[in-house]
């Protein structure tokens, strides 16, 4: 049994659909500015807010994918670890964070999986929503980048996400997410498209 077959079996056993193979074309590496942000960060990142015009310009910009090679890099690992420390820091106490919120316009989110045992935080590179249900509901949302504000937002109650598998980023996988965790994903993936929850009011 070859390595790719084992990967497919593992993904299926985890309830994940292996969707396709992503060739590494050598594109999608971190820029020198992004590397500087990652390497200069202390224990946590500064979170950008809409109150600052320069921050807001970054928050409103669309994000791009990373190459499989970059997802395996030390810089990517450091970025993910610092994103996780940032979102879980007592000063933030969030349930999700997107890379644009710390100044890096790449399609990376960290989300707390309330739908999994132990409610772990997990990182999803090159993530996007490929399907959303017509079943909608309003729920309260806040945002680390929109301080001191909460609003009711209409969201789909079930979605399918597609992302690069961390251990084997050349593979795209799909996962069905429901309930509150689906809302978190929608909120964070909006950030990757330059959209804030206040735009949906």
List where the protein language model places each region.
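Positively charged
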Residues: 2-201
């Amino acid at each position: 049994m070859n390595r790719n077959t084992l990967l497919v079996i593992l993904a299926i056993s985890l309830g994940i659909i292996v969707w396709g193979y992503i060739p590494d074309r050598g594109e999608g590496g971190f820029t020198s500015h992004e590397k500087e942000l990652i390497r200069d960060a202390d224990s946590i990142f500064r979170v950008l807010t809409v109150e600052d015009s320069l921050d807001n310009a970054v928050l409103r910009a669309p994000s791009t994918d990373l190459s499989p090679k970059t997802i395996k890099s030390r810089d990517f690992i450091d970025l993910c670890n610092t994103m996780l420390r940032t979102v879980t820091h007592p000063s933030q106490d969030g349930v999700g964070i997107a890379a644009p919120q710390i100044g890096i316009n790449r399609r990376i989110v960290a989300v707390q999986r309330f739908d999994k045992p132990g409610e772990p935080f997990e990182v999803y590179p090159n993530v996007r929503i490929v399907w959303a249900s017509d079943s909608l509901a309003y729920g309260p949302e806040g945002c680390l980048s929109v301080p001191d504000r909460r609003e009711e937002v209409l969201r789909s109650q079930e979605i399918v996400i597609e992302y690069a598998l961390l251990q084997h980023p050349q593979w795209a996988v799909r996962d069905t997410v429901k309930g509150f965790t689906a809302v978190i994903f929608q909120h964070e993936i909006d950030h990757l498209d330059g959209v804030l929850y206040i735009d949906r009011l």
